[in-house]
Amino acid sequence: MKSRQKGKKKGSAKERVFGCDLQEHLQHSGQEVPQVLKSCAEFVEEYGVVDGIYRLSGVSSNIQKLRQEFESERKPDLRRDVYLQDIHCVSSLCKAYFRELPDPLLTYRLYDKFAEAVGVQLEPERLVKILEVLRELPVPNYRTLEFLMRHLVHMASFSAQTNMHARNLAIVWAPNLLRSKDIEASGFNGTAAFMEVRVQSIVVEFILTHVDQLFGGAALSGGEVESGWRSLPGTRASGSPEDLMPRPLPYHLPSILQAGDGPPQMRPYHTIIEIAEHKRKGSLKVRKWRSIFNLGRSGHETKRKLPRGAEDREDKSNKGTLRPAKSMDSLSAAAGASDEPEGLVGPSSPRPSPLLPESLENDSIEAAEGEQEPEAEALGGTNSEPGTPRAGRSAIRAGGSSRAERCAGVHISDPYNVNLPLHITSILSVPPNIISNVSLARLTRGLECPALQHRPSPASGPGPGPGLGPGPPDEKLEASPASSPLADSGPDDLAPALEDSLSQEVQDSFSFLEDSSSSEPEWVGAEDGEVAQAEAAGAAFSPGEDDPGMGYLEELLGVGPQVEEFSVEPPLDDLSLDEAQFVLAPSCCSLDSAGPRPEVEEENGEEVFLSAYDDLSPLLGPKPPIWKGSGSLEGEAAGCGRQALGQGGEEQACWEVGEDKQAEPGGRLDIREEAEGSPETKVEAGKASEDRGEAGGSQETKVRLREGSREETEAKEEKSKGQKKADSMEAKGVEEPGGDEYTDEKEKEIEREEDEQREEAQVEAGRDLEQGAQEDQVAEEKWEVVQKQEAEGVREDEDKGQREKGYHEARKDQGDGEDSRSPEAATEGGAGEVSKERESGDGEAEGDQRAGGYYLEEDTLSEGSGVASLEVDCAKEGNPHSSEMEEVAPQPPQPEEMEPEGQPSPDGCLCPCSLGLGGVGMRLASTLVQVQQVRSVPVVPPKPQFAKMPSAMCSKIHVAPANPCPRPGRLDGTPGERAWGSRASRSSWRNGGSLSFDAAVALARDRQRTEAQGVRRTQTCTEGGDYCLIPRTSPCSMISAHSPRPLSCLELPSEGAEGSGSRSRLSLPPREPQVPDPLLSSQRRSYAFETQANPGKGEGL
């Protein structure tokens, strides 16, 4: 600037316009006011009613061009397109002219006097003081000041369009009009610079708001000014101020306002604050990782993202110009809410502008703004309040809050997708809960996520639900109807259970807010139908919190376990895969194994399965038989399923029909409905069409479950028998997916027929649970010995081989055999029911113990799922078809799903045992298989934050990997079956990051709702068997929804209670824990979040 001035000085005085002394320039030009001011003011008044006028900087090249024209032509044509397109270059040039004056318009010598004048607290006195100081101004300066002030007042009248109120204009103009030589010499450092800014802003704003009082009604000529000044000292100083006092403009400064007044917030330059804020916003918002490198940018994008309307307006105005400042933000808040942003923005924009004077002007404006704001605040004037600083502060706050929110809820997905491995990315993106901010966002925004809310009703969207958003849940829904009937056949149930668990995991990630533990009780007490669904979905599961009615959705999604999983499993994510494995198991076990946990801990992996099963049994309610059924389930399954009640033939028939039914998903749904309708009808429907046969058996089981909710023992007997057969079948199926599975299917069909007959007979006989339990126990004990030996022999062989091979292989074998049944499993809805029951823990315990408990041991032994949890067994064997269904539906994930079941056996067990991975800590003993699950699910150890996250978030995290990295563990396994579509959905939803959390949830909800119809019977399944809270008076209604698993739950409990031959290692005591079902429910309510979430993970992940 100095160099420019020097260069100009070299030329003739006539040629110099900028940087020339004002008085000298006016003398040479013969004008009362500088031509630059007059031309620019006229142009701005005509064309400059735009946002951010005088605050935004024009294009530097245009400013320089216009500057040269003024110096050469004296009066250039400002109406050329170049200037009309860049109006701000004209306003910037006008400010630059005053900024470059050797002596400021208000002169250096009067700076102290102005500062003293504004220091007066009372407005009348201040007005007098200011008038006295203005009288000391040279006449050219006074005329020019009056012309400029009237122009600015006129422009302030358009503040609605320009967002430039009197305060904003004062802030941007003050540094150009009033400066302190001493402060400039000091380099604008220290408190003196801030004081200068205050004085500048306060003085200029005061003059702007009192133009009429200070300059009279009309402009005064030079002589008039002189005479007027001399004549007015008394009148104006005394009378005029007092008279005009009532007339202060809206921006009148409070009488108390002083140079030092105002909050320190005003002190910093608005420009500085705003710029810093923009930069921080850019990086903090985490719009992109490179945002860190965008600090140099104007920050328009960042501000645009900010919720502030002013910033948005700034962006718009800024778009037209190159200046980074946003014209939309006014420099001052209050009357000039936009003014404050202007102060902030204006200075920042000038600085970026190439025009040095402009940037200086902005800086001084910034300083002035700072002063004005403190002064205004001190005065407390409504208009003069530091609206500008407030606006800036508010903008900063908004930016900070928005950044935090966006980082947590919006932008997390991008970073994860970019930097993290696929499995971690998917996990992170699904619940953006890995980040602490994300956890906050999910606690706030996450609650909004439909997935969290819908998760309670997995029936509607097992896969597409919150976590299983992908399409597979839909498939699972379809499979679920058939699977429910197939629940009797272990293999099919097993896959669906895994799918359910996965969906539950996903939902848990969403519903971590709604503690599964607490919501699970809600499910129980919500409604019979809803509760039944809730139980089926996850008695221990907590969909009830969100919406009892969502139980069906939760069931399909296997939400219950997922939610629990998340609360307890956050450590899972934090832990390494191995660590997470252990964490999952305890989580699954802790909730469900309130009573049986010790057992589970004592037991081996298989025993853990049984223990988990036992835990589920308590959840299931007074179904100790389930434990016994679990224990003696294998023998009973073989013996009882085949011989007990002499329904083995029927059971086989049911199995065959079930297989056929698997082949025909449509039939499954129909049969499912039939099963819901009545046991006989369901059985007949299932038998009538062998395609639906399996579904018929399951449906009969469902009916039995309904009845079993009343006659749980009877239903459990039948179911346990059916499950025993299913176990035998599943064990065979596991070892020999082809032939043995078929035999098992036949056996199970016969068993189902027997169960149906038994169920009918028992229902007719009075539905005596004890009688049924005794009968089942007797039959189961008999068959426990017979079939247990057979099944266990096979199972142990299978378990050994499969465990060695890995639960995945066992599940794969089952999946192969189950694949043939996959239609069955899909038809059963057993996947949804089983997994949901597992998730619910109680429902699963009943359903799985009946149908799956039997399989449980086989699966645990043969598949090594016993290590994971009983409920996994239940899910696998209790709902082998469901599991198979899950495995079959997404055959590729089948091994994974099998493995999750095997390891945490989340399918069979919602109970922590099944999850042995990283549950509350109960099932840690359950182990290797579970560990495999977790490993298979890279448990996203990425951030310890996960541990802090609610279980829902963890489960969410785990679910995500299912899509990107199908794993045998619960993360991937469960969704695999049921979430072929759901996985895609989930992965896109989580990993894509493109889908907002809410959008993903909404998608999951839609899918869940679509699938809800098919899944409801699964919901009822858990209801009937699992919860004492759920009215068992309506077992039929419950069974209809959860037919496959309810049978397993009911029959299995009977068997478990009566005969724990195989379950002996699980020990019948778990059956006793079943008796304190309400207690376990309470426990689960508290831990359900963790426990069920873990099983869901084990299965799904």
Curated annotation (Swiss-Prot):
Keyword Isomerase present in the record's keywords: the answer is: no
- Parts forming coiled coils: none
Role played: GTPase-activating protein (GAP) for RAC1 and RHOA, but not for CDC42.
- Compositionally biased spans, kind Polar residues: 1080-1094
CC annotations in GO: cytoplasmic vesicle; cytosol; intracellular membrane-bounded organelle
The protein here is known as Rho GTPase-activating protein 30
Q: What gene codes for this chain?
A: ARHGAP30
Where found? Answer: Cytoplasmic vesicle
In its UniProt record, which GO terms are filed under biological process?
Answer: negative regulation of Rho protein signal transduction; regulation of small GTPase mediated signal transduction; small GTPase-mediated signal transduction
Quaternary assembly:
Interacts with RHOU in a GTP-independent manner.
Q: Which organism is it from?
A: Homo sapiens (Human)
Q: Which residues form the Rho-GAP domain?
A: 20-215
Extract the Pfam families matched here: RhoGAP (PF00620)
Residues that the record marks as modified (Phosphoserine) are 576, 996
Keywords from UniProt, A to Z, are:
Cytoplasmic vesicle, GTPase activation, Phosphoprotein
